[in-house]
Amino acid sequence: MNVKRCFFLIILVVLFSNSIYAQEYGKQYEKCSERLKNVNDDSIYILRLLEKDSCLIGVTAPNFKASTINGHTIELHKLKGQVVFLNFWGTGCGPCVEEIPGFNKLVSHYAGKKVKFIAIGSDKVPDLKKFLKTIPFNFLQIAESEKIYEEVFKLSEGIPYAIIIDKFGKIYKMCLGSAGDLSFSFYENLIDNCLSGKQ
């Protein structure tokens, strides 16, 4: 088999795999969203939203490819073998900013271990870089990423929003809202359980 044909087949396999993962997530998302239909009461609707998210646990996470603000490329499915912590946030979100000290502590705590921390923000690159000069946030930073939030993961509940993905690429936990000062201990427990394979 010549090199060009081999390369072409590899590309086809990658594209096919990405499509399968997206379809699996999309199909389960539609199934989980059924419980939101015909719910008028706001408090019950929020409860159903949270139930919808928990319904997605165990599904293969959809792939995305994006660049960090420092120009490094991240492709989610290439991170298999590691626990991946995704944090959807924004610099203008007070509860998001409150979690940063705890999140920085998590990065230090898991240094050298198979855990990857990625912050996915809605801010433009210059605005995010300016913010980070004042308040360091030690996750890998992806900016202007509404597409990942809305189209890839199909989220709509708001931020902060965290997703923990296990070493097999499956969604382990989805968490809406801020843990504030407790962000380190709250997520340390979840990450430790994920690393050890506990449900």
Residue map of PLM features:
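N-terminal targeting signals for export/organelle localization
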Residues: 2-63
